[in-house]
């Protein structure tokens, strides 16, 4: 009976040692993961480039330089038939690619 108790205690302590070492390893790996609050500069740059691209495309359509584009109409404009074309939508007086 004593040997069975001793074996159970040793097994539990061995399991505890493995569990704590695995938990420490996960803590070390957790430092390498990106947290949700961290900003990613590459994604921010892409978003800025898209906004600039949308703005320039809208300006081209407004100026009539695009053969198939129509002028971007702001909300409340009297010319409701004029819209952005080619997948662009008018938002905040700018054509945005959707």
Curated annotation (Swiss-Prot):
Its annotated compartments are: Secreted
Bridged cysteine pairs (disulfide): 54-84, 58-90, 72-95
Keywords, comma-separated and alphabetical: Disulfide bond, Neurotoxin, Secreted, Signal, Toxin
Q: Which residues form the signal peptide?
A: 1-23
One GO cellular component term of this record is: extracellular region
Q: Which stretches are tagged as propeptide in the UniProt entry?
A: 24-50
Q: What is the tissue localization of expression for this protein?
A: Expressed by the venom gland.
**Pfam families, A to Z:** Toxin_20
Against InterPro entries, the record matches this protein to: Hwtx-2-like (IPR012625)
Question: Region Disordered: which residues?
Answer: 63-84
GO terms of molecular function = toxin activity
The answer to whether the entry has keyword Secreted is yes
Record keywords: Transferase included? no
Physiological role: Is toxic to both insects and mammals. Induces reversible paralysis when injected into S.frugiperda larvae. Reduces both the amplitude and frequency of responses from muscle (GF-TTM and GF-DLM) pathways in the D.melanogaster giant fiber circuit, suggesting an action at the neuromuscular junction, which is mediated by glutamatergic receptors. In mice, intracranial injection of 30 ug causes increased urination, myoclonus, hypermotility with circular movements followed by respiratory and generalized seizures resulting in death within 25-35 minutes of injection.
Which family, according to the similarity comment?
Belongs to the neurotoxin 12 (Hwtx-2) family. 01 (Ap1a) subfamily.
| Name of protein | U1-theraphotoxin-Ap1a
Q: Which species is this record about?
A: Acanthoscurria paulensis
């Amino acid at each position: 009976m004593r040997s069975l108790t001793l074996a159970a205690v040793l097994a539990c302590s061995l399991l505890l040692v493995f569990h704590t070492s695995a938990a420490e390893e996960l803590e070390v790996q957790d430092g390498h993961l990106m947290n949700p609050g961290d900003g990613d500069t590459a994604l921010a740059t892409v978003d800025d480039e898209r906004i600039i691209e949308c703005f320039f495309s809208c300006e081209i359509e407004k100026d009539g330089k695009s053969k198939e584009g129509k002028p971007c109409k702001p909300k409340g404009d009297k010319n409701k038939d004029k819209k952005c074309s080619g997948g662009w939508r008018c938002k905040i007086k700018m054509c945005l690619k959707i």
